[in-house]
Amino acid sequence: RIKAWEKVGDLTIIPGDYVNYEYVLNWFVENSKIYDIVKINYDKAKALRLNKELENAGFETNEIRQGFLSLGGPMQNFKEMLLDGKVIFNNSKLYRWYLSNVKLVMDRNSNWMPSKQSKSRKIDGFAASLNSHAEVLNMLVNPVGTGKVTYYSISDLMNM
C-alpha cells in the first residue's frame, strides 16, 4: 500500500529511521516556488526545530493548540464541509485511509477532537488538514455590511 501511494505521488519516502526535517523544509521551499504559501500551521509537540528552520527560511508559522476548545469548532466545520463535498482531496487513497483512521472524541461540552482508531493507525495527514482549516476558517466567512451595529433604546424608538 505504501509503495502505491508513493507511486501516485501522495507520499514521499525518505531514507532513515526517523523524519529528517531537512526533507520537510526542502519540500516547503520547493513548493513555495509553485504555490503562494501564506502561513504554515503546526503542532508544537514535535515541530519545534522544524518551525525555527521554517521561520529562518522566511516562512510565517503559527502554532495551533491541540485541544477540544481550539479544534472543536474547526473539526465540526471540517466534518460538515467534508459531508457537503466541499473538501477537495482529489480522492487520494492515502487521504481516505487517514480519514478511515479518525475517531471523533467528544468532551462534556460537545467539542470534538480527532483521535486515532488505534495506535497503529495514522491520522497525520488529516491532522495537518485540520490544523490548516483552524486558521483558514476565518477566511471562509464573507464580511457583510460595514460591521457596525447601531443600538437603539426603547426611548429612541418612541421618539423616531
Label the predicted regions:
Residues 1-66, 72, 76, 89-160:
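RNase H-like, metal-dependent nuclease domains and their acidic two-metal-ion catalytic environment used
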Residues 75-84:
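Short, surface-exposed amphipathic charged segments that create phosphate/polyanion-binding patches used
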